[in-house]
Amino acid sequence: MSDRGAGMTRRADDRVIVAGGGIGGLATALTLHQIGVPCVVFEAVREMRPLGVGINLQPNAVRELADLGLTERELDRVGVPAKEWALVGLNGNDVYAEPRGLLAGYRWPQYAVDRGRFHMLLYQNVVERIGPDAVRLGSRVTGYRKNPGGGVTALIEDADGATSEASGALLIGADGIHSAVRAQMHPDQPPIHWGGAVMWRGTTLAKPIRTGSSFVGLGTHRQRIVFYPISHPDPRTGLAAINWIAEVTLDNSEGWKQSGWFRQVGVGDFIHHFDTWVWDWLDVPALIGQADGAFENPMIDRDPVPTWRDGPVVLIGDAAHAMYPTGSNGGSQAIVDARILGAAMVEHGVTQAALAAYNEKLCGPISKLILRNRGAGPFGLLNMVDERCGGTFDNIDDVIPAKERTDFMAGYRAAAGFAIEQLNTAPGDHRARHARACRCSGRVTGAAARLTARAVTPDIRRTSCRGDRTERGRAPLRCRRRATRMPLASRRSSCIALRQAGGTSP
């Protein structure tokens, strides 16, 4: 396998095997390469193509992408910075609204991105930095065998049914909600959990509303719609790609469930649920009706498991914590998982101790977040409005006092790992203690040099993790006025610092 930039020769069984080439798997590969750990990703699809619609990247994930060397220009090509997050009642009045990203005081923006284009951006970075053989397409990990002398053997099946094996020091299960790695680790786990809610996802070209980059959720706990732009407006027409998710809780006896977990449907199949949702500032039927179609799937998750680790094997992303999308943080958490796992390897080496440290830090608090999202997550405010006044009101303060609303949202941000103060102050001592700097040309050890700053300014040269070249690039994704200059010696020898992602628990 190619491992350009590592600067050393390693045996195949020293590498880390990653099962799954989704967002979490690719973020893991980029992180491992950044800290000098060789890896190979096995992905079931024969060809990487942009799939999916909109997702949100919370500031805690954008911080990690910045440290991986992704630029603002790159993310602007696949999405837009979010300016506002708002909940609206059935009569079109605001329940709650707050600024997001830099406008809220974060040091990093929040992005709404086209999931498929963002995934391809990660894939292109993996191929460019590590090499074309870094991701083995058409190869699915079906299980694993722990080796008596240490390490692990992954069992591989290709797209034609042929089987093979791959050995490594560790196996990272990033193979999604239907994870084969998790199924072997927890053979008695209950089936996928479905609470009766069905989602229809699509995009429409329309003019953005409110701030022009607002995330808006409206309705009740049994019927709601979310929409936000995932592209910049066309300067000629003013139209942007508006991502929307319509959701209705149905009876379990509905026949659609037997036709599959994921399918493409016509808008006419569900638009009648929202035909009266028209206000002077938004016409929901018109917005949905312009779409060519939608993707229908049940809102599902998995019950938490007591551990994500089995010796040299560990789970990340949806394989570890598939959760309802009510918090808009599934993709973000997968990125944070990868970075915390990498930080643990910087501290403990490519060892089972690193997996244990990662598991200890995240499994408990993220398991609580799964259940919190199952209970509507931040949309719990809409549930409260529905319970107290039926969803319509003249003055929201008469229904839910301002402090109660603010405290509710602050509690969710803390639980999900992106409370402002918690995230903005996380680097500092935490970075110095838990994530020593990586040297692109050396082995990861506890004695690796530490970087004394976590960002570079636009006017200095930085060593890119895209190989050996240096580039005069834009600053990483953070408030540039707070950027500090990296010492020259560190710039010459090190990648951007990998440090503790931090702040994922309340």
Where are the language model's segments positioned?
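C-terminal helical "tail/cap" subdomain of flavin- and related membrane-associated enzymes
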Residues: 3-14, 75, 91-92, 327-329, ...
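Conserved FAD/dinucleotide-binding core of flavoprotein oxidoreductases
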Residues: 94-119, 123, 158-165, 203-293
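Cysteine-centered motifs
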Residues: 438-440, 465, 479, 495
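Short, intrinsically disordered C-terminal tails of secreted or membrane-associated proteins
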Residues: 497-505
